[in-house]
Amino acid sequence: MRRALTLAVLATCAVLPALAQVADLRSKTEFRVCADPAAVPMSSQDGKGFENRIAQLFAEKLGVPVAYTWFPQSRLHPQEPAR
């Protein structure tokens, strides 16, 4: 019984910080989107990608503007040097 209670307390302590951070991620004033500025046809900084259009549709339904954070995929996958 004591072991089960200890495990329950530890599990609760582990989950509480994660739940507290969720509130920081949600925004009621904008629809936040992270996208590659040059991943045509998916996303593009000029807003012509289909993911840009999907984000715009979601934002319209929520009644808030879209706020982009541009993150080029090349930062995640650096090109190999030419040989």
Curated annotation (Swiss-Prot):
The keyword Signal applies. It comes from Paracoccus denitrificans. Residues 1-20 form the signal peptide. This is Uncharacterized protein in cycB 3'region. To P.denitrificans and M.extorquens MoxJ. Keywords: Signal.
